[in-house]
Each structure stands twice: as structure tokens, then as C-alpha cells.
Amino acid sequence: MIEIKINTDALQNGLNNIAQRTSNTRPLMTQLARIMRNAVLDNFEAGGRPAWAPRKYPSAREGSGLLQDSGRLRNSITPSSTATEAVVGTNVEYAAIHHFGGQTAPHTILPKNGKALKFGGRFAKRVNHSGSKIPARPFMVLQPDDEQALVDAVNDYLDAALGN
């Protein structure tokens, strides 16, 4: 019987070395979360990528961009990361309906200041609103160039870890 033995110690040591050098992924995940946040902010700056549906009444809020009347939604976009994940999100309660679109529930509108509301020259103590159809304006999306930036960041991390 012929027996061939291969010493794989060098290979195993090399693999262990690679595992050691790539074990701290926290800086990478932090960078990926920042890249994703910047991509979302770019979506706001561009008015959507691709462009979002225009306002139903364009002159109503002239000057402010879509989804940016107060800036609250845009400013709420926050990155977070751990050693194993990179996440971008928002805690604004109306974010989902603007991102995915949908129909708001029927509701009653009451005056905030004063005793009555004025609609079309008429006054009312309350108005029964049937709800609004909100078009989808996806702002939490990555474009191909954003995805490439993520791939480049991972490649740079691996190159640095492997000494390339």
C-alpha cells in the first residue's frame, strides 16, 4: 500500500492568521452604516432616485423638497452598527407610509388653535376626513453606485487585513 501524507500546518496557520486579521469587523460595519446613511440622504437631496411622485398640489409648499417640509424625517435617518451588522433606520412614525405609500385612515380634524376650522370659505367645528392616498416615495433604497461603494469598502477592509 502506498501512503501519501501532506503536511497542512502552513495552510492551517495561514487560515488562522486570516481569521485573526478579519475578526474585528466593527470598524467595517460602522463604515458600511455611514455609506448607507449617505445614500439615503442623497435620495432626499435628489428628490428620489428615481424621482418621487410630485406633490398633488405643487404650489402648496413651494421651496421645500419632497418629504422635507420640516426636515424631521430626513434628520431622523440614523446609522447603527455592531460587529456583525450595519443598519440605517428612522424612528419617525410616518416614515413607513411615505416609503411604501398607502391610504391613511379616516379621521376627524379638529381645530388646534381657536374654535373653528375654515375650509373653502366655510367654518366648521370639525371635519370628517375620508383619509388620503399617499404615493410611495421610497427613500430607504440603495442605488447601484451605493452598492458598489459598499463592495469597495469591504474589499478595502479585506485588502488591509490581508496586507495587500
Could you tell me what each predicted segment is?
Residues 1-99, 103-164:
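Short, Lys/Arg-rich flexible segments
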